[in-house]
Amino acid sequence: MARIIDGTEMNLIGATVRKYRKQRKMSQQALSGKLELMGVYVCRGSVSRIEDLSRTVTDIEAYAIAQVLQIPMEELFEGAKEKFE
């Protein structure tokens, strides 16, 4: 069985967050601000680390990110399947 996280990747959704954030022409600061309006405090630097796979993401943060990006939660994990193969 393949290892899911090799010690350098701290989450499975970072690349997807970056993809959809950029598609929506949203800056990391804007994403951070929209999350804050929902009561979820993720600073711009943390958004950067999430996208770089160097920060873990809580379930609450993942849910809020999906809401802000207007995508289903499952969509956040679109690239995760390859990690299991």
Residue ranges and their predicted role:
Residues 45, 52-64, 83:
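Short, basic-rich loop-to-helix N-cap that marks the start of a DNA-contacting helix
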Residues 15, 19, 33, 49, ...:
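DNA-binding alpha-helical recognition surfaces that contact promoter or target DNA
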Residues 22, 33, 67:
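Alpha-helical residues within the helix-turn-helix
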Residues 1-24:
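A short, Lys/Arg-rich alpha-helix, primarily the initiator
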Residues 16, 27, 58-61, 72:
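Residues that mark the N-terminal boundary/hinge immediately upstream of a DNA-recognition element
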Residues 25-49:
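Short alpha-helical DNA-recognition segment
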Residues 22, 36-37, 52, 81:
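Residue-level detection of the helix-turn-helix DNA-binding "recognition helix"
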